């Protein structure tokens, strides 16, 4: 048992699965994920325009 034979025998990266192998459920799931991501990006854009929601909370006085 030499030191060179140890370790993983299989490759680290798995071969990519082609799009033809995906069934209808996987295609629908990916489409739904894309739509959700678009909605999330739109909401982030709208939220960035309005500014921060903070402003209340505990106010500290300058006295010690």
UniProtKB/Swiss-Prot annotation:
<dbReference type="InterPro" id="IPR015157">
    <property type="entry name" value="TMA7"/>
</dbReference>
<feature type="compositionally biased region" description="Basic and acidic residues">
    <location>
        <begin position="27"/>
        <end position="45"/>
    </location>
</feature>
<feature type="region of interest" description="Disordered">
    <location>
        <begin position="1"/>
        <end position="64"/>
    </location>
</feature>
<comment type="similarity">
    <text>Belongs to the TMA7 family.</text>
</comment>
<feature type="coiled-coil region">
    <location>
        <begin position="21"/>
        <end position="50"/>
    </location>
</feature>
<feature type="compositionally biased region" description="Gly residues">
    <location>
        <begin position="53"/>
        <end position="64"/>
    </location>
</feature>
<keyword id="KW-0175">Coiled coil</keyword>
<dbReference type="Pfam" id="PF09072">
    <property type="entry name" value="TMA7"/>
</dbReference>
<protein>
    <recommendedName>
        <fullName>Translation machinery-associated protein 7</fullName>
    </recommendedName>
</protein>
